């Protein structure tokens, strides 16, 4: 799961190309594929790592199998602007991209992109930031690759409850209640809301009483989380026993704030993240955070490429694990230590 690999689905898809020699559904043999990718923010650590692996995997596939098909990938940064992203998709379509992959800026505003792609008959793979189900049903060439946000919240909550029950030092004031703060991704963002809601409800379902001291929206960003955590430390100080962060970058922002405040690491609250980014795993290894929930960026990147390749070649999608013909979801993994393959 954590090491680079070529998925069985990808191999099956490419072997089908070799066996059949088929081109796309239009009848002409495909000799090149152009994939356009728009990310909501290139500085988002998880998204950046996922796209890096997407490119690496595409190169691995091209080098390891004689497909007689060249793959070109154009990556655009929407810089947190839906208008910019819409214009980027327009450019990709005008430039002749065969497949569009979109990491939506605003999950509630995909219609412009969908309409443009449908007019050009170019399939769209949305990824990581899940659009509303009804929008994905607007056309039969729309797909989503990602994970189920609630699963990460449940796993984060399970880790928090387990730590509280098994580490007496986690209950710093000894009152039998886990006092916590939340670092939330975005205001009114479905994934952020779901991760927080399920994390907290899971802790209480595990029989651990909690008290919410405060929360801050830090937009998935480490620097913003540093600022927000510093403010929360000023207000609540050592009352904070648990930091529930919607992603690793914000968890690391909390770490930065603790260091800036000169607080000894032994006195830090329990800090938990989500994503299992490279920097997040490094912080887990050295004990700065107590746990993270691994969001399989490698698996998602590979599945997205497999899907894009098969769509562009007009190949069957049977081996790709699509749910309802639309969704590919990779499972999360709970991590309280770094796996050996990441050492």
Regions found by a protein language model. Give the residues of each.
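Extracytoplasmic "Venus flytrap"
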Residues: 34-61, 74-87, 97, 103-108, ...
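Hydrophobic alpha-helical segments within soluble ligand-binding/sensing domains
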Residues: 29, 85, 143-176, 225-226, ...
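Short, low-complexity disordered leader/linker segments with a strong preference
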Residues: 1-34, 65-66, 93, 115-120, ...
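Hinge/cleft segment of the Venus flytrap/periplasmic-binding protein
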Residues: 31, 176-187, 191, 202, ...
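Hydrophobic alpha-helical
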Residues: 90, 99-119, 124, 199, ...
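Short, solvent-exposed amphipathic alpha-helices that sit
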Residues: 46-65, 152-156, 190-209, 224, ...
